Amino acid sequence: MKYSLIKYRFQNGSEAAWHRDIAEFIAALDGDPALKGKISYRCMKSRNGCDYYHLAAAADDQAIKTLQERPFFGQYRERTRLAGGGSVEVLPLEIVAETKAPA
């Protein structure tokens, strides 16, 4: 698995509309036969603030390549950039240790 953390501070637009955009992106991931089961995606935000954290996991490099070829990915990436006021950080992650059964 390949993991990435996407983080930014929400700065533009309606938070409710942004949450709908995120849900639509996740639905597109789940609905794409070539990506289903190969990409995991979660979005979280700080409870008392405007900081957002997206955790993405891909089964392999091919899943990432396939995702990057999808028009919905480019559109979502641009919307994320706009939501973050042009400042979005993407951090590749590696697991150091984990429980046997992920929650």
Per-range role (PLM):
Residues 1-70, 82-103:
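Short S/T/G/P-rich N-terminal loop/turn motif that feeds into the first structured element of a domain
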Residues 72-73, 77:
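Long, charge-enriched, surface-exposed interaction segments in small proteins/subunits
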